Amino acid sequence: MESILTSIKKMLGAEEGYEQFDTDIIMHINSVLMILTQLGVGPAEGFSIEDDIPTWGDFLDDSTKYESVKTYVFMKVKLIFDPPLSSAVIESMNKMINEFEWRLNMEAELSKSN
């Protein structure tokens, strides 16, 4: 599995070796991981990263059910770290984020009941 930090950096358009903004990106990723924990996704005790070592597999037991987590984390980090200039794009991203939150929460609830 790919590193959480590395994959988010790639989606943000930053090269893997460019570490200038790693501290900022890590802080934003950890904020989003906290939200996911509150939604019931990921380890119940919470999860955070400090570098490019933790992978998506470390955060998620069953990555096939939660594949959208990667997109969700990217979109939330993008809006915080490098928001689009267009208000229409921001609105569209926020709608998608809301849908991801609803779907991820539903999947987490279904997984708990099984």
What is the meaning of each model-derived region?
Residues 71-82:
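Short, hydrophobic/amphipathic alpha-helical patches that form generic packing surfaces
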Residues 1-65, 98-114:
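Conserved short "hinge" loops at termini or chain/domain junctions
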